[in-house]
Each structure stands twice: as C-alpha cells, then as structure tokens.
A protein has these predicted regions:
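Metal- or metallocofactor-binding catalytic centers and their adjacent structured scaffolds
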Residues: 232-265, 271
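Conserved short loop/turn motifs at secondary-structure junctions
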Residues: 1-3, 101-104, 181-183, 254-263, ...
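Helical mechanochemical/support elements of P-loop NTPase systems and associated helical scaffolds
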Residues: 7, 11, 78-86, 104-115, ...
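Intrinsically disordered, low-complexity regulatory segments
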Residues: 1-162, 166, 430, 457, ...
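Basic, low-complexity terminal or inter-domain segments flanking catalytic cores
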Residues: 2-3, 90, 173, 282-283, ...
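Short, polar/flexible loop-turn hinges at active-site or ligand-entry regions and domain interfaces
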Residues: 71-74, 102, 122-126, 147-154, ...
Length: 702
C-alpha cells in the first residue's frame, strides 16, 4: 500500500478521487491500495533562538551572532494533531512506500521532507511531479513516479533558503534592534526590496520639476512639433515667427514595423498584469491562480517559465481552437495557431508557463468568484495573443520646415491588427479600458509628399513640466525585483533578481504588515519607519546584488553545482562580519527611532520576556517587539485595588529589579494601609501577574 501526502486537504481530495481512495477516515482517505493524507502548509518550522540556549530569549548584543550547528524544528500548536497522524501513517505496517505529492517546487519539497525525517521514516520514497491537477495529468503522474532521491538537491536548496533567511533575519534584526533601541525587522529579500522603494521615494522627493515649452504648428488636419525647450521666450519667438506663415514638407519616411506577440505568463508577469489592469495585489493574484489550479482550471502557478514543452502542442492547439470559437475575444483571432512560437523545452525547467486547462470548456465562468474569473480570462486571452499573428503597422515620420525651423509629425497606419485585436476586444469589456485604448490608439497622418506646401499655418505653444519618477506599483516593483542585480551578474546566471516568483508576493505583504510600506491605491509608499531602517542598514544587507547572487547560488545547490555546506558557510561568515563591524549605533542615526508606541525616545526598561525595549504609551508600558505581548497597564487591577497606579518610576524599577518597595498600599478587607514589596511575577501569559512579599518583622526581646 502506498501512502500519498499532499500539501493541503483540497489537493489530497483531488488525488484521492483519481486514485480511488474514496473511504473517508479521520485525517486521510483510503482505498484501491492507497492512503491519501495531507500537510497543512509547514508542519515543522525552524525553532526560535531560545530553543538552542535559554539565554537567547533576551535580545543581547553579546550573544550575537547566533549560529546553530544543527537546525532544530518546532511544531505549531495547531498542527500537532496532523503531524502526529502523518507519523502514525508512515509507521503503519500496511504502508510499504511513501509518495511525496506536495507542490512540485522547492517549498513543497521542504514541507514533505521535514515530516518524513521527523517521523524517522525509512520506507522507499517516490515523487509526484505534475503541472496540472486535471485527472489525466494526475494519472500520468502516478504512472511515472520519480525516485525521491532525484530531488535530494532540491531539498538541500530548500533547507539552505530557510537557513539563510533565519541567520540573516535573526542576527541582523536583533543586532540593529539592540543598537537603536527599537525593533527593526531585517530580511534577506525584504530589506533590499524596501531599499528599492526608499531609493525611488528619495528620487521623487529630490526631483526638481522644470517647465518645458514645445512650439507646434497645425496644418492640413495634423500637428507637427518642434524641439522641446526650457526657455519660454525662445519658444515664444518661434511661435510668433511661424504663426500664419507657410510651411513645406522637407521629407517623408515610411517604415513597416512589426510587434511580436507577447509571451505566455509566468507567475510574475501574471501578477504584474493583474495589478496594472485590475489593481490586484501580487498576493491576491497568487491566491486566485492557486485556487484555479486546485479547481483544475489552470496549470501550476509558481513557475518562472513563459514557454510550453513539445509534448503539450496537440493539447494546446485544441484548447486554442476552443477559446477562439467560444470566448468573446476569440473573434479577434486570425490565422492558424502558431504553437512553435511558445514552445521551447530548453526554457522549461520545473514547470511550463501558466495556461488554462481544457476544463475551461466544461466550466460556467460566471459561477467563479470575480477575481478567479478575471485571472482565468487573462490566461485565456494571453494564450490566444501569444499564438496568433504579429501586429504590423506602417510608421510615418514627416519633417516640415517653417521659417527655417524644423517640426516633426508622426503617425502610423495599422496594416495587420494581429494579436492586438484579441487584446483590444478583451480590454473593451473591462473597466478603465476606454482610456487605455485611446492612449494607445493609432493616429494616421494624411498622405504627404516631399515639397508639399501649407499656407498660413496656425502656431501654438504647448507647455508642460518634466515629470518626476513615478512611485512604484506592485506591477513595476515586481519588475524591478525580477531584474535587480542582473547587470552585475554573468549573462549565463540561471536566476537573477530578488526572491523567486513564489516568494515575492509574501515579501511585499511582510513589508506592509511590518509597517515599513503602505499602500495608497496602486502605489507602494515607504513609511518613515521604512526609510529610517534603510538609513541604518549597511550596503550589503540592503543591496539587491548580494541577494540576487544568493538566489543564483541556491539554484546551483539545487543542480548539485555547489554544496549546501559552502553556501551556508558564506551566510554564516556574513553574519559574523555584520556583528563585528557594527558594535555601536551611529550618532547621526540616534534620533531616527522614537518608540512606535510611546511618547518618549528613551526606553523605560527592557522586556523580561524577549529583551526588546519597553516604552511608555498613553495607557501603559509596552514591549516594542510586535511579536511579544508583554505590557504593564497603568490602570492595572492589582494596583488600582490598592489605590496605586504603575507610574514610569514604578515600571522602571519593576523592569530593572523585578520588584519595588511600596508604602501606603490599601487593604480592601481592613480599610487600612500597609507596606510591602510588589514583585513582578510574569509567567508569560496574556496578562502580567504580581504578588506581594512582606518584610520580616523583628521579634520582641524577651
């Protein structure tokens, strides 16, 4: 009997249905020689520093860098039951082999392997590697299972990725948080991405907008423009010289140009397009296309390829013909499908481009949630665009002379709409399409000939301002992340850029949730906290070049070209250097980090739970670590019952000594006052507890 382990319940249900495992059990399905169960995402996570040494529970410079020799893992409380079940199933005597059916990628491999190793399982392991959840694809995958050992290097790369994120995240976060007295979350991919946003914001803020002036002449139903100028008087002189005078055509140049169809979508280009057209965040798009994949309507989403493989050509051709004949935008499709244009086995590694599956023909799209419907429609539109005719037009450039000044008029005439007709029909059906269409609309010039003369032209002055750089949107930031550091890497480097298609969306969400970035409509704007963090970080942490190199090295680990040990040694060395080179806060950054919760710059004390600074707020004293719940409330029930409150001096004493001597404590029972030591008795729960300790009374002399 085979035990099949999927990444999530919905996928397990689909696999079980195809395999005939229809008998429901508690946490798994059984039947036809299979047990089918699931993980719920990561069942095991890298343990926090205090799991290695108790002293690491507090954030202290002298403990850095923290470099575990062997990784420890912990189980989230809400996942212990499922992990225990999988361990039991792996040890079941009926099970003679285990099939890894988690997502076919680096993270999916890590999710399964950690469970397999945690259970101490030694049974043969096989790998299901598919790019579609269609029944036929599942059957094909189970008919051709791969030896699990084929993916050992993929697992090594996954462990390295997680380990590198832990080492940089833990050490850099603690280092700069301790130095500057406020929690500063640093991440291997997150920080360079934030740096891109901060640099763009700096470029915008420092930009000095200057006006420009363009003299123009209108004649024969078209407008020709002169040279852009910065001096109004100069441009105005040209306008006055030309107005109501004659102009003649000095030259006419015609050139037939071709725009090739776009490539198919990989995850990043799909996320960019969805943000630009619909305003969806990268995470929303990933969620929608993941759901479509699980519903068997789209192929595997976490891909960086924009091509198909040769064995898909027949299926793709029949799908294209169905889309052409049944979808509204199919009316714009011309000619026979050119599948060869989107086929290249050498450019497909783990997974091919994202396309719809044939299940779309059996699905009522109106019943899908709007986000999923939008994404699936885009996938269908792109498949048609990528395989139909090229877009061809004639570009015309006319040079006119008026009073010795040169003016240029440009226009174009569509010769073959090609793929742009499919796109045009689709865009006309969605919101904000009219404006976009008009902006891209071709403007044809009248027939012009050299020497042609126009009498009494109308001259005018067009004014404008040089625009500053635009704020990043998720569309443009994803593009920047994809190419970051590419110019500093060799041409043959397999992976360039920040993060992977599968992780970029999560990186953006972390930046927002950590308070480093805020969304304003489609724009991503760094906050003051984000700007200040980038100000104090060293160049190698915030530079995309080093992180892009690491991504390329992880690919080398995956292919067996670099050992996991070599990779991790480099990360550890960087962690050591980081701590060694930053021993004290820089004076120029001293005032950048007032408490996000408090009113004073100075910390009241140190959190007894995590070692982060504690600041005074309006209603209490709070740990600055967002993940820590420690708080001393000013209007505390324990103190208020004794007609006292936690003042700043009381809080400081409790945090420093763990106790404070207080006089005049009120007794609700006797109505009298007394003196006692108040002791901070924190057990790590939601609320902080206190207890009293009374001074020992001296005995009477006999």
């Amino acid at each position: 009997m085979k035990l099949v382990i999927a990444e999530k319940p919905s996928v397990a249900m689909s696999l079980a249905a195809v395999l005939g495992a229809t008998e429901r059990k508690d946490g798994y399905l059984e039947g036809s020689g299979y047990l089918v169960s699931w993980c719920v995402g990561h069942l095991l996570e890298l343990a926090q520093p205090e799991a290695y040494k108790e002293q690491y529970a507090k954030w202290r410079y002298e403990d850095l860098p923290i470099l575990p020799e062997n990784w420890k893992y912990e189980v989230p409380k809400d996942k212990k039951t499922q992990l225990a079940l999988l361990c039991r199933l792996m040890k079941d005597k009926r099970v003679d082999s285990v099939v890894c059916a988690t997502d076919a990628g680096r993270e999916g491999e890590l999710i399964f392997r950690l469970v397999y190793e945690y259970a101490g399982c030694k049974k043969p392991m096989e790998r299901l590697w598919i790019s579609s959840m269609e029944d036929a694809a599942i059957r094909e995958g189970f008919d051709h299972l791969h030896p699990g050992s084929d993916y050992d290097k993929l697992y090594d790369a996954a462990v390295c990725r997680a380990g590198a994120d832990w080492l940089i995240g833990i050490n850099a976060t603690r280092l700069f948080s301790v130095l500057y007295g406020v929690t500063l979350n640093v991440g291997r991919v997150m920080s360079p991405t934030l740096a891109l946003l901060v640099q763009r914001e700096s470029d915008i803020e420092s930009f000095i907008s200057k006006p420009f002036y363009v003299p123009e002449i209108t004649c024969g139903g078209f407008t020709a423009s002169g040279e852009k100028m910065t001096e109004r008087s100069e441009a105005e002189k040209i306008r006055m010289d030309c107005d109501h005078n004659s102009a003649f055509v000095r030259s006419v140049e015609k050139q037939v140009k071709t725009i090739q169809p776009p490539r198919l979508y990989d995850l990043t280009t799909l996320q960019r397009e969805c943000n630009r057209i619909y305003g969806y965040t990268a995470q929303q798009t990933l969620d929608y296309v993941q759901s479509l994949y699980e519903k068997k309507l789209a192929t595997y989403p976490r891909t960086d390829s924009q091509y198909l493989t040769k064995d898909m050509q027949a299926t793709a051709a029949s799908l294209i013909l169905w889309l052409r004949d049944n979808m509204p935008f199919g009316k714009g499709y011309a000619g026979e499908p050119d599948i060869d244009r989107v086929t290249d086995d050498s450019k497909v590694t783990d997974h091919h481009a994202i396309i719809p599956t044939v299940e779309i023909a059996r699905t009522d799209l109106s019943e899908l949630p709007s986000g999923e419907r939008d994404v699936l429609t885009l996938l269908a539109v792109r498949l048609l665009c990528a395989t139909t005719q090229v877009h061809r037009f004639e570009a015309v450039t006319a040079i006119l002379d008026c009073q010795g000044y040169t003016f240029t008029a440009k226009g174009k005439t569509i010769l073959q709409s090609g793929w742009k007709e499919v796109e045009r029909i689709h865009r006309m059906s969605i919101r904000q399409s009219e404006t976009e269409h008009k902006e891209n609309e071709a403007v044809a010039l009248p027939v012009l000939q050299e020497g042609q003369t126009f009498e009494a032209v109308s001259a005018s002055l067009r004014e404008g301002k040089i625009s500053p750089p635009k704020h990043y949107t998720e569309d443009t930031l994803l593009s920047a992340m994809e190419t970051a550091g590419a110019e500093d890497m060799p041409e043959d480097a397999e992976r360039k850029g920040l993060g992977t298609p599968a992780t970029r969306a999560a990186t953006l969400e972390k930046l927002v949730s950590a308070g480093f970035v805020q969304r304003k409509k489609k724009q991503l704007i760094p906050t003051e906290k984000g700007k200040n963090l980038i100000a104090v970080l060293p160049d190698n942490i915030k530079s995309p070049i080093l992180t892009a190199e690491w991504e390329s090295m992880l690919k080398q680990v995956e292919h067996g070209e670099l050992s996991a040990t070599s990779f991790m040694d480099q990360i550890a060395d960087m962690s050591r250097t980081l701590v060694k080179e930053h021993t004290t806060p820089e004076e120029r950054f001293a005032d950048l980090f007032p408490s996000s919760r408090g009113t004073a710059h100075e910390a009241v004390g140190v959190c007894p739970r995590c070692g982060a600074p504690v600041y005074e707020g309006k209603k209490g004293f709070f740990c600055d670590n967002r993940e820590c719940s420690f708080a001393l409330w000013k209007d505390n029930r324990f103190f208020s019952s004794k007609k006292k409150s936690i003042t700043k001096s009381v809080a400081a004493a409790l945090l420093k000594e763990g106790r404070i001597s207080m006089s005049g404590l009120y007794s609700e029972k006797t109505g009298k006052t007394y003196d006692a030591e108040v002791i901070l008795d924190d057990t790590g729960g939601k609320y902080v507890n206190f207890k009293l300790e009374f001074p020992v009374k001296k005995g009477r002399r006999k």
